[in-house]
Amino acid sequence: LAAFAAIGLALLYRAAEGVRHAPADQPAAVGVVPRESVARLENSIAVLPFTNISNEPDNEYFCEGISEEILNALSGFRQLNVIGRTSSFAFKGSDVGIAQISAQLGVGHVLQGSVRKVGKQLRISAQLLDEAGRQVWTETFDRELANIFEIQSEIAAAVAAKVASQVTSSA
């Protein structure tokens, strides 16, 4: 029994030697395996949390909500490989570039956006970028703030349909 335990520990140690770690002066993003790059999935996309660029910090929940709604809507397209919320939202507020995010997550496309709110007016901008950070598609949606969930669902469906078409046609 001791021999099996020793062999198991030796194998575990050898496997751990191959694991790459982020440098000590650069903490790894939470929920993301720190690595240089992974093989890119075909028809793949990560949805980053949309940025709140209004003067109201309380709008963060709406930004995360619209991002999550879009992610969920994209997941409904079978031909897409959509990176999960935990992995993509780990880059919230980071200064990591799109090319590096794409390489770390193994995706060919990244969707990012912003939300502005002034009074009852809402502007949501979405941008689809390729793995090099080049803009592939963009659209802006202006709405009057009434039913927040209805707005999120409506815009998420529109963005997901357009993004899915762009991602699958570029493969």
Feature locations, PLM:
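Acidic, proline/glycine-rich low-complexity intrinsically disordered segments
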Residues: 2-171
